[in-house]
Amino acid sequence: MTGSPHKVTRRQLLRLAGVSGLGLTGLGYLAGCGGAEDATSTTAATASGSKDDLPPVRIGYIPITDATPLLIAHAQGYFAEEGLEAEQPALIRSWSALAEAFQAGTFNLTHLLIPIPIYLRYARGFPVKVVAWNHMNNSALTVRDDGPIRSSADLGGRQIAVPYWYSMHNVILQMVLRSHGLQPVIQDQKAALAADQTNLLVMSPPDMPTALSTGAIDGYIVAEPFNAAGELLAGGRIVRFTGDVWQNHPCCVAVMHGDDVTARRAWSQKAVNALVRAERWSRENKEEAARILSKDGAGYLPFPENVIARAMIKYDLETYGVDGGTGAIRHPEWRSSRIAFEPYQFRSATKRIVQELKQTVLEGDTSFLKDLSPEHVADDLMVYGLVKTSLGQWGGLAAFDGAYKDYERTEVIEV
């Protein structure tokens, strides 16, 4: 079940979704329709159809390797083997557009940066559910190789792009900035910037390497393969891997509409089964996964195989270590991978993310975070039963990265 992804333009996407006129920041348009209860019924009407069938799996994705399980499950026919029809995945360029389309029911299974469903559910009342982690790690901070920035300590007075305000990239970057005594700010790029300030701006991942090479920005933090593309195609230098700051952190998660999870439990379980199987296969076959994803293979990602293979595999001290490398790896004892695969949503990570979001500079109204309980988010947003059932079929936690022995872990963060 391979083939080029169906590329949806912004105008086509909004027309399909029935939400023409929304701004790019309009994640929460459904809030104006009456909160979570009304949002649930809207989802049921637009995305779910009848309650007792097995609808086609409709996947939207950003062209990053975070989407690997969704795309490999489609390419390898894992959805079909679960008895589900899967439409050709649709490539979307920006997180705003993808989140809008998911809310509107254009897609019933997608990946989102884990802070986005937190925002959707608790700021906007949209009934999203996180059914699995898509991966761990897989992001980095990239700067110009011929520029003055040699480490994250040199980011003062600089313009750094993030893919989205509600992203692990923004959260981890600001943790790093604070550790160096730098203040993250959000302001116009033309405004004066103090030496101890770093200006953050949102940019779609596909635009980042070009912006770096032309000098429009000083650096970016984003998912792969845009860091590998920056290295190979845009004169970039990786100065820190996010997985070397927060060991095996989640980033993108697989999400469904809450109505589907409750009313279509069999469909939801089958879809998660396919994702977990794809994660295990991808962990054990990274070179082949890179080929399939690349434009030299099934064409899901608009990059040649060598770029995606580098993004998934290259993680050596000679290139990235402190002694003689770029310094992107400072904790080799963690034995991390550039991308790791483990589908279970550890409660400790969810709780720490909520805690960190409360300290992160974000654009827009963040009042919902003030009284948001990390424990409540871990209980309410995550659906654990589906992935636990799937893990039972595919070797348990021991068959995945981290080789965790049970469903609890301690978060390790060392900036």
Where do the model's predicted regions map?
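N-terminal secretory signal peptides
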Residues: 1-12, 20-27
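Extended low-complexity acidic/polar segments
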Residues: 2, 16-17, 209-240, 313-318, ...
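Bacterial lipoprotein signal-peptidase II cleavage site
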Residues: 33-42
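Conserved C-terminal helix/tail region of periplasmic/extracytoplasmic solute-binding proteins
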Residues: 349-415
